[in-house]
């Protein structure tokens, strides 16, 4: 609207200027007026028009100043023949306009020079109108003085408005307020309407997009349906030809259906497998039915084979190095001395466990490779899981209807699905047969193992009465445990531990191996791919066990101090030898009875020669302690680790509690029949046997320790970062073919 008004005003000004010039006596042909057309043509100065502009300026100023004055003003500059005269003419016109502005005849303006230079635009038209209006007044005054005196011109409207300004001001303000309110109301309505339309547009756009997507989806489904219909029609014709031409189809269909039903019937057994001790073995988790026997046997072999001088020198070197490290950290060597001896002894044990891969059988005289039962079960179960996953993938083919087994039967050759399914089932049957062989051999070995355990039990029960004073005082042992439970730590470590460890290195244990070597067919390669990662896991396990040993170091310090006070200065050599001899037996019994704490739970990642004995933990394993010892509060796994130290715990067992250690151990190897007779409710390994003689307090004590000793999963994720990556056994040819298929 504003632009239209400005254009209308420009046109009115130009038309009024032409009218004034015509009144002053301008020739109509100059502005293009003919005899017939009475209205002047406008828009002549929209573009630069210096010729017409100079002519109009000369005419208006000549009319204003008279012929005599104008001849003087425009001498030598009019008429214009070149650009120099044009510049001089504009200078003369600028001087006359400045004079008129100084007299008040024209309003002042800063754009006179540019307007005169261009001779176009609304400002130049306004200048011509102002000059023509002023010239018309002056000419009218000079020509008709009597008329001017009798009929004076009215005063300008600007002066009248100024005289009534006081009255018009409040009215103008009120009108401004009213217009403002009206504008704000209209603006608010417009904003609301715009928001409403915008929301409606968004909703319509979203609905349109949804409809487009639905249309595209329905179109795709329609195309799929048409393709499927055509495919079914084509395959139906081929199938009809096959049914009519072949007589073996019914037999193949029935066989395939029977095989498929057997696979689908056994599909639910994988979920039960994932929650039992077999899966604990595969995932390297700690379980109460499992203990690494090879590490303890290797430690006993090494302790009997290493000379005393070498062991003492190794102890001194390790003690010095550990003392230097400890002095750099906190400057307390006394709290570290005992721990350095234990670490050096266990370092020798771990080094010796590598040598037990090819152990010489004393009775047969031939070298038999030690078979890791846990590793065998782990790899077999891993293969079975891969086969199970492949069967599930086959089960999902064709939307759950099973694979098209008879697709290529018409070609005269065997189907690829038939071959893969037959190979899968054959390998499944082979693994199950291998499991049965393992179970049978474990049953054959179990009487010898139990016989060895019973002989060790009889030897422990027939201990001579000439024991060191430590074993005779049960009250002193209970007071040691009470001081250990209450957390009182005594400073200083006795050197008797070093003497005891060095003495243990000279004693030969008669029964080194409690179980004959398992003889199994060579089913897997001797160097699995998981050995490298197992080594990494073993390093992390060693670090975790060292942390737990550091935590329980203060508790062992207090007990060792009490032992050094109660022990005489000079023990007889035969008594010390017998004491250490029986103590080493108790080490093995403690390892077979009491599992390690959660900190050392990953000792299953040792080398391939480690043996694993599946012995259930019964309540009688804890009934050998006195009643006041059971009443002590235990402080988590650290207290249990210190309680299971065989160096000072086992000799404190009274004779009345010793016979009940192995009295309630169930026949675990008979429970392995559950691999054959599978029960969905009980799992694979059932916990058989419970202590009916134990009191309620003993039963509650066993329940508490059961939760501590058999955690379902270690909560320290740093120790289990790549536990499941160790399951990647080498692929067999059948598995590789299944994966490619």
From Swiss-Prot:
Keyword hit for Coiled coil: yes
Bias (Polar residues) occurs at 538-551
Q: Name one GO molecular function term.
A: microtubule minus-end binding
Q: Its GO biological process terms?
A: cell division; megagametogenesis; microgametogenesis; microtubule cytoskeleton organization; spindle assembly
Endoplasmic reticulum recorded as keyword: no
Q: Which segments of the protein form a coiled coil according to its record? A: 213-239
Q: Subcellular location, in the record's words?
A: Cytoplasm, Cytoskeleton, Spindle; Cytoplasm, Cytoskeleton, Phragmoplast
Which of UniProt's keywords are assigned here? Cell cycle, Cell division, Coiled coil, Cytoplasm, Cytoskeleton, Microtubule, Mitosis
Cross-referenced InterPro entries: HAUS_6, HAUS_6_N
Family listed: Belongs to the HAUS6 family.
Any idea what job this protein has?
A: Contributes to the assembly of the acentrosomal spindle and phragmoplast microtubule arrays as part of the augmin complex.
Q: How does it assemble?
A: Part of the augmin complex composed of 8 subunits. The complex acts on microtubules and interacts with gamma-tubulin in spindles and the phragmoplast.
**PANTHER family referenced in this protein's UniProt entry, alphabetically:** HAUS AUGMIN-LIKE COMPLEX SUBUNIT 6
Q: Give the protein name, as stated in the record.
A: AUGMIN subunit 6
Q: What is the lineage of its organism?
A: Eukaryota, Viridiplantae, Streptophyta, Embryophyta, Tracheophyta
């Amino acid at each position: 609207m504003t632009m239209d008004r400005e254009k209308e005003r420009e046109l009115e000004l130009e038309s009024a200027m032409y009218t004034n010039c015509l009144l002053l006596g301008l020739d109509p042909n100059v502005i293009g007026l003919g005899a017939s057309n009475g209205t002047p043509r406008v828009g002549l100065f929209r573009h630069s028009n210096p010729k017409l502009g100079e002519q109009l300026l000369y005419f208006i100023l000549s009319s204003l100043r008279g012929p005599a004055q104008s001849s003087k003003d425009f001498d030598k500059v009019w008429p214009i023949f070149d650009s120099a005269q044009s510049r001089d003419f504009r200078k003369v016109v600028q001087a006359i306009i400045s004079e008129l502005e100084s007299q008040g005849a024209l309003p002042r303006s800063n754009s006179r020079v540019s307007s005169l230079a261009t001779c176009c635009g609304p400002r130049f038209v306004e200048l011509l109108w102002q000059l023509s209006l002023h010239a018309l007044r002056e000419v009218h005054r000079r020509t008709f003085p009597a008329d001017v005196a009798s009929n004076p011109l009215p005063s300008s409207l600007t002066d009248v408005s100024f005289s009534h300004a006081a009255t018009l001001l409040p009215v103008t303000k009120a009108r401004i307020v009213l217009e403002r309110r009206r504008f704000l109301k209209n603006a608010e309505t417009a904003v609301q309407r715009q928001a409403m339309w915008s929301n409606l547009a968004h909703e319509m756009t979203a609905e349109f997009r949804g409809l487009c997507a639905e249309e595209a989806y329905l179109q795709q489904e329609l195309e799929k349906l048409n393709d499927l219909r055509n495919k079914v029609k084509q395959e139906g014709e081929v199938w009809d030809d096959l049914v009519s031409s072949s007589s073996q189809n019914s037999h193949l269909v029935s066989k395939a259906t029977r095989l498929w039903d057997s696979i689908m019937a056994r599909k639910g057994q994988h979920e039960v497998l994932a929650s039992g001790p077999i899966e604990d073995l595969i995932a390297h988790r700690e379980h109460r039915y499992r203990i690494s026997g090879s590490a303890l046997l290797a430690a006993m072999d090494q302790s009997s084979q290493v000379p005393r001088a070498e062991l003492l020198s190794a102890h001194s070197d390790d003690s010095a190095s550990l003392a230097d490290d400890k002095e750099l950290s906190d400057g307390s060597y006394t709290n570290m001395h005992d721990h350095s001896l234990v670490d050096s002894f266990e370092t020798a044990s771990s080094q010796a466990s590598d040598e037990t891969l090819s152990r010489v059988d004393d009775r047969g005289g031939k070298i038999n490779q030690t078979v890791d039962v846990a590793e065998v079960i782990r790899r077999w179960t891993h293969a079975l899981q891969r086969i199970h996953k492949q069967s599930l993938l086959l089960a999902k083919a064709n939307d759950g209807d099973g694979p098209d087994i008879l697709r290529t039967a018409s070609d005269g050759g065997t189907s690829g699905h038939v071959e893969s399914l037959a190979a899968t089932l054959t390998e499944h049957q082979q693994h199950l047969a291998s499991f049965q062989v393992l179970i049978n051999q474990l049953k054959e070995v179990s009487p010898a193992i139990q016989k060895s355990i019973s002989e060790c039990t009889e030897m422990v029960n027939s201990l001579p009465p000439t024991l060191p004073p430590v074993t005779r005082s049960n009250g002193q042992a209970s007071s040691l445990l009470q001081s250990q439970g209450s957390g009182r730590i005594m400073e200083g470590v006795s050197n008797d531990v070093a003497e005891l460890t060095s003495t243990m290195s000279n004693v030969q244990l008669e029964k080194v191996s409690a179980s004959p070597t398992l003889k199994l067919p060579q089913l897997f390669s001797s160097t699995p791919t998981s050995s490298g990662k197992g080594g990494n896991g073993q390093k992390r396990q060693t670090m975790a066990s060292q942390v737990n040993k550091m935590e329980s170091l203060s508790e062992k310090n207090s007990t060792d101090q009490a032992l050094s006070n109660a022990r005489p200065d000079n023990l007889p050599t035969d008594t010390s030898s017998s004491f250490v001899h029986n103590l080493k037996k108790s080490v093995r019994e403690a390892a077979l009875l009491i599992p390690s704490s959660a900190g050392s739970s990953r000792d299953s990642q040792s080398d391939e020669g480690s043996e694993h004995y599946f012995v259930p933990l019964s309540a009688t394993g804890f009934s050998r302690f006195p009643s006041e010892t059971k009443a002590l509060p235990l402080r988590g796994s650290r207290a249990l680790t210190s309680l299971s130290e065989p160096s000072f715990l086992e000799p404190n067992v009274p004779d009345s509690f010793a016979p009940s250690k192995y009295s309630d151990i169930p026949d675990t190897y008979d429970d392995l029949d559950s691999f054959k007779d599978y029960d969905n409710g009980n799992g694979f390994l059932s916990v058989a046997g419970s202590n009916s003689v134990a009191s309620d307090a003993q039963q509650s004590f066993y329940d508490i320790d059961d939760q501590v000793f058999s955690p379902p999963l270690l909560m320290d994720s740093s120790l289990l970062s790549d536990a499941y990556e160790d399951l990647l056994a080498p692929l067999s040819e059948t598995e590789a073919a299944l994966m490619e298929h």
